[in-house]
């Protein structure tokens, strides 16, 4: 039976400068006695550590932890890149044999293979991000993505001029349905008459497919697309920037995911990133490692991170696009969620009932 664990230390801390994509983490501190004998590693899903999204955020958390303790890649922490699903078991096995104290599987697609490895290596501690494995040596880390998606839905509803917005998902799954459901509920809470188009690429690593979907959506009059599709979302950004380059006066936007994807939207003097639903995977990864170092492994427990723990937020980096009235509306709805006045749906069935009740 899975138990609910407590989310501690790292949540709510201030943002740190991150080594985005570099292999080594460096710091002025010498490795502490506590960290000298502790090591952690992660296996990516197909998106990889440079996906500018979910996997990259997890890797940044691992790097941050390493930097805090004077460690470097290959000497205290590491990652194994998965280019195909067939890489999951070999990557997990290699890290086990390299004797890492805590091994993360990044993404729900690793669930089946991580379960097999965890059952085989019962003395090794594991953690899975974005899914649940009910084993005594696996901590399950999940996020309340529907909360953040609801809030960017509110922002999109306040921003759209065509009353048409889109959602691009990676793989049609219960996890990504949480993003879809929250987004639709947020949009409809502001204006039930706004049309929300939903399409899935069935991949987290197909930028070309993402670009095609975005092209069709923008051509249909949609002016804001929220993506929850990992590397596939790079194609959404590329299409938006291509359109903006050819028609600088056209107002169209992308809502990023997982990290603040402001930089991905830059095109000359413009930026097509409206906002991002920031999911602090880095915070969760670093937090769980720090707890494991103290002997608190949380195997068999579910650790949930949401807006209550400052692990889910809405980016306001694009100050020109995220105007004060939009930010005010987002904050008002955030308070309603925190106060329990709004129960954000996380499935299509719950979303249908929520919208019908507006």
Predicted regions and their residues:
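A residue-level marker of the well-folded mature domains of exported/periplasmic proteins
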Residues: 19-358
């Amino acid at each position: 039976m899975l138990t609910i664990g407590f989310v501690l230390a790292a949540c709510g801390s201030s943002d740190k400068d991150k080594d985005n994509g570099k292999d080594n983490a460096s710091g002025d501190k010498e490795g502490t006695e506590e960290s000298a004998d502790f090591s952690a590693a992660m296996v990516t899903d197909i998106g990889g550590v440079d996906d500018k999204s979910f996997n990259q955020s997890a890797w940044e958390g691992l790097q941050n932890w390493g930097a805090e303790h004077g460690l470097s890649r290959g000497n205290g922490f590491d990652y194994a890149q998965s280019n195909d699903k067939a890489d999951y078991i070999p990557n997990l096995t290699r890290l086990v044999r390299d004797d890492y104290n805590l091994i993360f599987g990044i993404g729900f697609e690793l669930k089946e293979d991580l379960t097999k490895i965890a059952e085989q290596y019962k003395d090794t501690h594991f953690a899975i991000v974005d899914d649940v494995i009910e084993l005594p040596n696996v901590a399950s880390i999940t996020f309340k993505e529907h909360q953040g998606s609801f809030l960017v839905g509110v922002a999109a509803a306040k921003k759209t001029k065509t009353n048409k917005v889109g959602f691009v998902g990676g793989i049609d799954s219960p996890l990504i349905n949480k993003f879809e459901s929250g987004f639709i509920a947020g949009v409809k809470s502001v204006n039930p008459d706004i049309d929300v188009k939903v399409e899935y690429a069935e991949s987290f690593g197909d930028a070309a497919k993402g670009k095609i979907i975005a092209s069709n959506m923008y051509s249909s009059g949609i002016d804001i697309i929220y993506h929850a599709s990992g590397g596939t979302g790079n194609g959404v950004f590329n299409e938006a920037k291509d359109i903006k380059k050819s028609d600088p006066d056209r107002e169209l936007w992308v809502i990023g995911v997982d990290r603040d994807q402001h930089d991905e939207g830059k095109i000359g003097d413009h930026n097509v990133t409206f906002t991002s639903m920031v999911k602090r995977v880095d915070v969760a990864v670093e937090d769980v490692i720090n707890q494991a170092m103290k002997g608190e492994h949380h195997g068999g427990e579910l650790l949930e991170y949401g807006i209550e723990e400052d692990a889910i937020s809405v980016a306001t980096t694009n100050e020109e696009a995220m105007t004060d009235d939009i930010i005010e509306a987002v904050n008002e709805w955030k308070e309603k969620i925190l106060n329990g006045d709004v129960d954000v749906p996380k499935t299509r069935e719950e979303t249908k009932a929520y919208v019908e009740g507006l």
